[in-house]
Every structure is written in structure tokens, then in C-alpha cells.
Amino acid sequence: MSQLITIERHILEQQKNFPEATGELTDLLSDVAFAAKLVRREVVRAGLVDILGFAGSTNVQGEEVKKLDLFANDKIINAIGQHGRFAIMGSEENEGIIIPPKNETGSYALLFDPLDGSSNIDVNVSVGTIFSIYRIKSSDPGNASISDCLQKGSEQVAAGYVIYGSSVVMVYTTGHGVHGFTYDPTIGEFLLSHENITTPGSGKYYSINEGSYAQFNDGTKRYLDYIKEEDPATGRPYSTRYIGSLVADFHRNLLTGGVFVYPPTTKHPSGKLRLMYEANPLAFICEQAGGRATDGHRRILDIDPSELHQRTPLYIGSMADVKVAEEFEQGIR
């Protein structure tokens, strides 16, 4: 690009299109970008310092916690929570809500997965941070409660993710398109690299953990058989691309087209992915880029949450590909 545009400048430029904007979202997203820089610094050094491996505890999901998970969680809470812009926060790693300092001046709720795919960090596979921002409903921020977090995904005012891979990329939306920024370590800034991202209407890749095939329902099994069949007219067979890091799989499919499927299984009949920390923010981004995201029956952003750590199946990606997967899940095909 002929002109270097930082994420802060880009957000400010976008803000000019909305005279009623207060600038709060600019500050919020700048805080997230700063926290991402801190996490990135440790991710790239993870093999050199003692933050690999397990911490010897389990999180609220019943999963063994990685040391880097805890580090990322603490860094994000401390870096973002100290400025008084958030009244309440929720993390995949914390059982309950988090009340940050100076919360009485905050107007927003932050929900986040500090380090998605962290089980892969030991083998140098991409990991990421996923975040979601809501405006609180409480009239008194000092008394913000879990109900301020339990909002439908359609109520999000911003969402995004940071992927830590061969390069570090931050992607976000405020409901007016999707934009991506690549981190330049020589100047310490996220620079605009993917403006107005639109996902292809269909793709040629599918992402699913086929190791769970025996636990899939008949609809999912028939869907997998279908996309593996030879049919040039419909672009089949599709090719499998599955990293095992949600944010990395989603990012690839967002740019190249395709579908990510995490269906219900006999082990996890309500799905395994977290609605508030993973499905909602990625669904917001996907829809803004022209894609589709459902639980196989309902639009993800229309689900009314009842729990902070609620789980859901997820079908997300290119519009046409998600619709086909849904039809098999619903028994239409």
C-alpha cells in the first residue's frame, strides 16, 4: 500500500462517517490492540521462557489450563480493565464475571477468549484472541451485572480477533464492514492490510474434526459423504483444511471461502464452542463480510443466552456452503 494507516487512524477515519460517534469505540479498540501486542510479545517468546505446558489447574470448562492461557488472560484484564471504559468483563478462563477497576465510569461489557487454540502453541501452530464488545444495559455502571453480558450477539457494537501466526493480524468490525491489520514489529503498530474484507459466496474447503465422526449424527455424516463426492458441476469434492485452532481455521475460510463446522456430538449434544466468547464475535464478523453463521437451525446472533459459558454448535463461513450444511443438519437433504 502507498500509505501506511494504523488501526487507530483507521478507526478515527471511520468515525467521521458517524457524526453522533463519541470516540469511545476508538479508545476501546485501541485498548484491545495494545493488549494484543503484549500477548504477541510472549507468544513469540513462548519456547524461550517458562510459559509453555500446563499450569496444573483446570478452567471453568473443565479443561487443563496452559500457562500461556493464564498469562494472556491476566495481561488482557490488566491492560484493558484499568482505564475505566469497561463496566464489566467476562473471560473463557474465569468462572464468573470480572469487575475491573474504575468500572463505575464504564459503559461497555467485554467478553473474550484470551488464547484460542492454546493447546497448539507447543508445536508452533497459530493461536488467537477473540473478543466481543456490548454496551451495558444497566443505568448504573457501578452495579453492572451478568445480565449486561448475557445479550444476544445482534447487540454487539464491536467484535474481532487477533491471530498470532507467521504474522500477527487483527481483524475487527463495528457493524460497518470488516477490516484487517497486520502488526509491523519494526514500528510496533497494526497497519491496515485488508480493507473491507468480503468472504466469497462459496468456497472449496471444509473444516471439521473428522476424528469425532463416530459421534456425529446422521445429518452430519451424510453431509461429509456429500462434500467428498465427485461432482464438477457443484465444485465437489471439497478439500479438508482443519488446524484445530478455531481462529486460524475461521480466518483462512473468511479470506478464501469455505465452511467451518463444529456440529453437536453424542459427547457434546449442545455443541462444544462457547456462544459468548467464540461463536457470537465470529458470527458478527462473518455476517459483516457477507457470510453466514448458525447453530444448524438458528442464526447465531439471534440466540438469547442464559449462561456466561453457554455452548453451541457452529456452522460458519461462505453463505452457500453454510446453507448446504444446514440442510443436512435439518434433514432437508
Curated annotation (Swiss-Prot):
Q: What gene is this protein a product of?
A: fbp
What this protein catalyses is: beta-D-fructose 1,6-bisphosphate + H2O = beta-D-fructose 6-phosphate + phosphate
What is known about its subunit structure? Homotetramer.
Textual note on the cofactor: Binds 2 magnesium ions per subunit.
UniProt cross-references to NCBIfam families, sorted A to Z: PRK09293.1-1
Q: Where does Mg(2+) 1 bind?
A: 92, 113, 115
> Localized where?
Cytoplasm
Q: Which SUPFAM superfamilies match?
A: Carbohydrate phosphatase
Q: What class of enzyme is it?
A: hydrolase
Binding residues for substrate:
116-119, 209, 242, 272
Q: Which residues bind Mg(2+) 2?
A: 113, 116, 278
Q: Which family does it belong to?
A: Belongs to the FBPase class 1 family.
According to its UniProt entry, this protein's organism is Chlorobium luteolum (strain DSM 273 / BCRC 81028 / 2530)
> Main site of residence?
cytoplasm
Molecular function, one GO term: fructose 1,6-bisphosphate 1-phosphatase activity
The EC number(s) attached to this protein equal 3.1.3.11
Q: Name one GO biological process term.
A: gluconeogenesis
Q: Which UniProt keywords apply?
A: Calvin cycle, Carbohydrate metabolism, Cytoplasm, Hydrolase, Magnesium, Metal-binding
Cofactor(s) annotated in UniProt: Mg(2+)
Superkingdom in the source lineage: Bacteria
In terms of HAMAP family, this protein maps to: FBPase_class1 (MF_01855)
CC annotations in GO: cytosol
Q: In which pathway does it act?
A: Carbohydrate biosynthesis; Calvin cycle
Protein name as annotated:
Fructose-1,6-bisphosphatase class 1
